[in-house]
């Protein structure tokens, strides 16, 4: 049992703005836990989750933190972010059928130029499940995107054109193997 302190909203690479519950740290199975996915808007509405409510938290499959229930229902106030927390574009609620046939509501940012979405698309592209390019962390990608070295995926393969500038950045050096 703990207190939900905040709901953070973060855009995914597809534009869905994913909610995460931040709560007072609790120990479950020897691990300190203070965050759990809230999945979608439907989950938040069904549990009537609002900051300040008392919640019950468990671990699913002995690993994944999960908010099981709201112990103080009846105080729900719709708190959908009106704008994307990253780019400020207006949000939209989408409805789709879940695997069980129930209607699921999700919050989306429809801005294709949202920095967070772009960064996450690049992070996925270089990741193990896609191109498996080692050495390009999300932080490095964000730096290269900000500096304009990356605009499209093929730009990754032409970073050598910016070698002199990159070597001037803190933490970058030339390595010979």
Kindly give the residue locations of the regions a language model identified.
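RNA/tRNA-interacting regions in translation and RNA-turnover enzymes
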Residues: 1-177
